[in-house]
Amino acid sequence: MSVTKSYEEIIDFIAAGSTPEGVVAFHPSEALQQRVAELVDQSKQGSISAEDQAELEDYLQLEHIMIMAKARARQNLGN
């Protein structure tokens, strides 16, 4: 799985016409969660390749964007 999959999941979610409720409820797929867990484990063990490190960093940026989007969606919902 490449970082492209991370981007594809978020792009598909946005393109489907997300609502504030949908943004709050969004979670990455199980496959993506497993891939990220693998990358984190590799990073902790010091055995991560440069390509995998870049993939992990890209995912972390996307995760930050989604955290911020969820916070904004909660504000829009009045929570």
What is the meaning of each model-derived region?
Residues 1-79:
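Extended, charge-rich alpha-helical interface modules
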